[in-house]
Amino acid sequence: MSSVVVVGTQWGDEGKGKITDFLSENAEAIARYQGGNNAGHTIKFDGVTYKLHLIPSGIFYKEKISVIGNGMVVDPKALVEELKYLHDKGVDTSNLRISNRAHIILPYHIRIDEADEERKGANKIGTTKKGIGPAYMDKAARVGIRIIDLLDKETFKEKLEHNLGEKNRLLERFYELEGFKLEDILEEYYDYGQQFKEYVCDTSVVLNDALDDGKRVLFEGAQGVMLDIDQGTYPFVTSSNPIAGGVTIGSGVGPSKINHVVGVAKAYTTRVGDGPFPTELFDTIGDTIREVGHEYGTTTGRPRRVGWFDSVVVRHARRVSGLTDLSLTLLDVLTGIETLKICVAYKLDGKTITEFPASLKDLARCEPVYEELPGWTEDITGVTSLDDLPVNCRHYMERIAQLTGVQVSMFSVGPDRAQTHVIKSVWRLA
């Protein structure tokens, strides 16, 4: 038995999809455990670029099981559209398994999400407006509708009718928006469920059986540790737990069955949406990194905020997710920058702190303490091993490992699979 969790160590968009796709080659089952279609994964497979939001990266390997876990919130319409997108490109999806316990996103979740973000004005969180938060709210309030409910028309109608009474009052009286009629949703969404019911099962059984049979299972996180609802920059976070601990809740696999946790980190830092970002750059270097790194959101298309690598953030990720390995991505983007900076600590009211603070007021007053390292000018996109990297690039990676306390086991120097390189296998048994 061998299992690996892939988590983002920053604010998402670290290249998890690419690393998951790379590691999928040696996995026999790949599972997502939280989030929904608010997360975007860009994957290159056989020379074709795919953009996925719900379906795990492992879908391209038809001999491997690809799982949408119970911790996810699934927009049935978006799922049907994504399946069609893959089918139109000739991708076989018969290896997909969808948890019957996953909750669904309905049109009223999306409308409430949009209205609430608009209402907050300057205090907006930066949600993708996909209905994720309201769906998780219903789940916590025990009024959510699960996929197993969607497949039974009588149950779906009963639960939907009950929820619409409350949601319409909220939309009409508080947000002053039009509500929904039962018939607006019932037939359309029941039909969506019928289109993917062949994939629906108890995915906890599927995953545990695979592990008990000695198979390799890969768990694919969405977003990143700093967007975790408990450990991130609350309230500028997502509504679920992207940290490694979310795997056990969101997949139905116990913690004793997790072997390694791979933290994916960009060689710099980015963030989409509002919220604190201590190392953010507002100069030409930031603009250069954004353009060279194509730093625009997969889901929203919004320009990402860009900053220097922050070891305080990744140390926090190491601690709360129990990172065993680090995968450093987009090293090639930094080529040509004369002097690189790594944030080693923060200054808060004249005092040096080395751990990420919980208070947003404290964060707003934090000034990054930088260590400067010489950059490199050599093209590294064609290297095939660690030894091929320029000495300054290797020193940069070594310093990141020292400052974060996590070994760099993989690094990436471009978007293609062949540009991801292994220093130490994360599939090791010890």
Swiss-Prot record:
The keyword Transmembrane does not apply. Mg(2+) binds at residues 13, 40. It is an enzyme of class 6 (ligase). The active site is at 13 (proton acceptor), 41 (proton donor). It is found in: Cytoplasm. CDD domains: AdSS (cd03108). Its cofactor is Mg(2+). Pfam families: Adenylsucc_synt. GO terms for biological process: 'de novo' AMP biosynthetic process; IMP metabolic process. The keyword GTP-binding applies. Binds 1 Mg(2+) ion per subunit. GTP binds at residues 12-18, 40-42, 304, 330-332, 412-414. IMP binds at residues 13-16, 38-41, 128, 142, 223, 238, 302. It catalyses: IMP + L-aspartate + GTP = N(6)-(1,2-dicarboxyethyl)-AMP + GDP + phosphate + 2 H(+). Its main location: cytoplasm. Keywords: Cytoplasm, GTP-binding, Ligase, Magnesium, Metal-binding, Nucleotide-binding, Purine biosynthesis. InterPro entries: Adenylosuccin_syn_GTP-bd, Adenylosuccin_syn_Lys_AS, Adenylosuccinate_synth_dom1, Adenylosuccinate_synth_dom2, Adenylosuccinate_synth_dom3, Adenylosuccinate_synthetase, P-loop_NTPase. GO terms for molecular function: adenylosuccinate synthase activity; GTP binding; magnesium ion binding. Pathway: Purine metabolism; AMP biosynthesis via de novo pathway; AMP from IMP: step 1/2. HAMAP family: Adenylosucc_synth. Plays an important role in the de novo pathway of purine nucleotide biosynthesis. Catalyzes the first committed step in the biosynthesis of AMP from IMP. Belongs to the adenylosuccinate synthetase family. Homodimer. This is Adenylosuccinate synthetase. It comes from Listeria monocytogenes serotype 4b (strain CLIP80459). The gene is purA.
